[in-house]
């Protein structure tokens, strides 16, 4: 869903109104993503059912993300950048403990939220637009923010991350 013709060449031509999911018949959960395994351990669940896994994921997301009915937001605003291993190694030497996810032998994914937090943006605002206090990937409307204010905050954060880490982060949200 992150990359498709609907986000690129068909962006202004089509509106998706329905989807069909093709689900696997065999249940094979990925428990190594984020805090899933730790959350399951606190509940003494070793082999979760699909329902238990769903409940844990919803619990994790609700703890980190603001309710859009209460505070305007579009969820994760930035994509996590994938960098070459040499770039990651150089940054890891400067920032021990920097989180990352190995993509393959030549690439690492660095959490954009971590970089935004390291730039001091978590919980901060620029005008009426701000960065959520629990998840730096989420930009929020503090009340009455315009699209221009959200874009200005986005671009300011992108500039700060580029200056500090030498990495371009890109919005996941389509902004016009």
Residues of each region from the PLM?
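Phosphate/pyrophosphate- and phosphate-bearing ligand-binding catalytic cores of soluble enzymes
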Residues: 1-148, 164-176
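Conserved ATP-binding N-box helix of the HATPase_c
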Residues: 161
């Amino acid at each position: 869903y992150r990359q498709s013709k609907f986000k690129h060449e068909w962006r202004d031509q089509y509106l998706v109104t329905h989807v069909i999911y093709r689900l696997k018949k065999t249940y094979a959960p990925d428990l190594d993503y984020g805090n899933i395994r730790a959350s399951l351990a606190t509940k003494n669940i070793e082999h979760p059912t699909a329902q238990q896994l769903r409940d844990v994921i919803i619990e994790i997301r609700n703890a980190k993300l603001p309710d859009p009915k209460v505070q305007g937001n579009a969820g994760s605003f930035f994509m996590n950048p994938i960098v070459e291993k040499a770039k990651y190694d150089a940054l890891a030497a400067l920032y021990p403990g920097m989180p990352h996810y190995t993509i393959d032998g030549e690439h690492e994914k660095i959490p954009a939220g971590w970089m935004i937090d390291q730039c001091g943006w978590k919980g901060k605002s620029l005008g009426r637009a701000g960065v959520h206090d629990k998840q730096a990937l989420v930009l929020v409307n503090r009340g009455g923010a315009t699209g221009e204010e959200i874009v200005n905050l986005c671009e300011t954060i992108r500039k700060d991350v580029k200056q500090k880490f030498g990495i371009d982060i890109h919005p996941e949200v389509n902004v016009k």
